[in-house]
C-alpha cells in the first residue's frame, strides 16, 4: 500500500500539529484512491472542534456528521482517511506507532496518518526513513509522518509514504543557500577588482 501526500496536505499536516503542539491534533484526509490501489492525499483538513489532550484526541461526533454530509454532496472530494499527531510530553518523546485505541478507530479502506512532532535537537533534511516514515525538521520542530491501513485481517500495517515536495523542499533550500553564497562571493570578487 502506498500513500502520496501533496504539497498542500504536507503543510496542512505540519501546521495542524504545531497549532496545538504538546496536545494532539485531529483531522480528515481528502483525495482519492487510484486504480493501482494508491492513496493520493490532496488535502488535510484539521478539526477545530476536536477534544484534545496530551495523549489523545477525540473528534466531535456532531461536527463529524455535518462534515460527512457536506462532503457527500461534493463528488470531487472524497474522505480517504484521517490524521492525528503524537507529541512529546515532559521528557518523553512522541512515537509514531499507532496505539491500541488508534487501531480500534481505524476503518477498512481508509488510511490513518500519524504526525509525530517533537522538539528539534538538530536540523535534519527531509528524507524517507528505513522504517517507512517521512522525517525532517522545520523551525524548532522535528517531524516523523507515517501512514497506516487495516489489512484483510483487521491488523494495522504501515503503508509506504511518499511526498516528493518535502524531499524537493530541502533540495531547493540547499540550492538557494549555495546560490546566495555564490552571489555574495561574486559581489566580494567584483568589489576586490574595482
Question: Model features per residue range: what roles?
Answer:
Residues 1-81, 85-194:
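MPN/JAMM (Mov34/JAB) isopeptidase/deubiquitinase module and associated MPN-bearing subunits/adaptors
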Amino acid at each position: 500500500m502506498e500513500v502520496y501526500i501533496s504539497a498542500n496536505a504536507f503543510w496542512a499536516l505540519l501546521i495542524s500539529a504545531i497549532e496545538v503542539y504538546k496536545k494532539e491534533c485531529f483531522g480528515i484526509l481528502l483525495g482519492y484512491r487510484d486504480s493501482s490501489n494508491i492513496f493520493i492525499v490532496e488535502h488535510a483538513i484539521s478539526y477545530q472542534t476536536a477534544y484534545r489532550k496530551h495523549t489523545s484526541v477525540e473528534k466531535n461526533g456532531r461536527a463529524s456528521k455535518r462534515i460527512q454530509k457536506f462532503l457527500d454532496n461534493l463528488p470531487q472530494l472524497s474522505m480517504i482517511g484521517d490524521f492525528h499527531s503524537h507529541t512529546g510530553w515532559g521528557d518523553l518523546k512522541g512515537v509514531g506507532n499507532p496505539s491500541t485505541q488508534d487501531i480500534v478507530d481505524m476503518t477498512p479502506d481508509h488510511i490513518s496518518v500519524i504526525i509525530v512532532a517533537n522538539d528539534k535537537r538538530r536540523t535534519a533534511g527531509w528524507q524517507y526513513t528505513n522504517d517507512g516514515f517521512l522525517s525532517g525538521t522545520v523551525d524548532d520542530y522535528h517531524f516523523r509522518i507515517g501512514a497506516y491501513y487495516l489489512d484483510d485481517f483487521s491488523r494495522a500495517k504501515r503503508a509506504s509514504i511518499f511526498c516528493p515536495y518535502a524531499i524537493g523542499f530541502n533540495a531547493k533550500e540547499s540550492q538557494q543557500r549555495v546560490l546566495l553564497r555564490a552571489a555574495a562571493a561574486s559581489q566580494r570578487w567584483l568589489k576586490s577588482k574595482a
